[in-house]
A protein has these predicted regions:
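Conserved ABC ATPase "signature" region
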Residues: 124, 136-151
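Q-loop/switch helix immediately C-terminal to the Walker
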Residues: 110, 115-130
């Protein structure tokens, strides 16, 4: 089932029939109420209501400058909203602190890869900084699955933009978080890599996870409950 909603200067998600009858049950674990965002002297959006249950995929769209990145950064706790509240499992994310952070994986529109480090070093160090220790053998297997076999030890600066993007996306194979916030992660990916990302997200949803993906591309999934949220300027 697909739902969509668009408005001007505001954004609101239609919660009718928003329950997901999948492995994760039927309880909305992410609830956003009257959320607003102001950058400088410009209001990006206001009155955003969102109610999300396990197994839900939200495709976040809108023109450049409409607030997609700001919304994702607010949802992951990196940016404070101008007004409104975000609840996770019934509790305000501000009160949850690190407990909420441990449930979230945020990948920004930049791949976040350190160019002086190898693909292998990037994956292991990034995950260690996020509290996930992985062995060298596991990291090599993940990079192989991401189509980077033979390039694991190369400095990231020698990789193509698409390959660096794959290094960043490799985190999704080793994280154990419930909420994925992905900002334009399909950029610079070929069809094979897009198919791989689709498979990763579908598996995440099947396990009761939630994925909110900001993208300019049409990105359909074959599983889970799909909603569309469009921000406008």
């Amino acid at each position: 089932m697909v739902e969509s909603e668009r408005s001007r200067r505001t954004a609101r998600e239609d919660i009718a029939d928003s329950r997901y009858n999948g492995a994760g049950g039927t309880i909305d674990i992410l609830e956003v109420s009257k959320l607003g965002c102001v950058r400088g002297d410009r209001r990006l959006f206001s009155g955003l209501d969102l109610s999300v249950s396990p197994g839900t995929y939200i495709q976040l769209t809108g023109p450049n400058g409409s607030g997609k990145t700001s919304l994702l950064r607010i949802l992951c706790g990196l940016l404070a909203p101008a007004e409104g509240e975000i609840k996770w499992n019934g509790a305000n994310i501000r009160s949850l602190g690190e407990e909420y952070v441990a449930d979230v994986t945020y990948l920004g529109h930049r791949h976040g890869v350190k160019e002086e480090l190898s693909a292998l070093e990037n994956l292991r160090i990034t995950n260690a900084l996020n509290g996930v220790e992985i062995s060298k053998e596991r990291a090599l297997a993940v990079l192989k699955e991401m189509g980077l076999a033979g390039r694991e030890s190369l400095p990231a600066r020698l990789l193509s933009e698409g390959q660096r993007r794959r290094v960043g996306l490799a985190r999704l194979l080793v994280c154990n978080t419930k909420l994925w916030l992905l900002d334009e992660v399909l950029t610079s990916l070929d069809k094979g890599a897009v198919a791989l990302v689709r498979s990763l997200i579908e598996n995440h949803l099947t396990g009761g996870g939630i994925a909110i993906v900001a993208t300019h591309q049409e990105f359909e999934l074959s599983t889970g409950h799909t909603k569309r949220l469009e921000l406008t300027t």
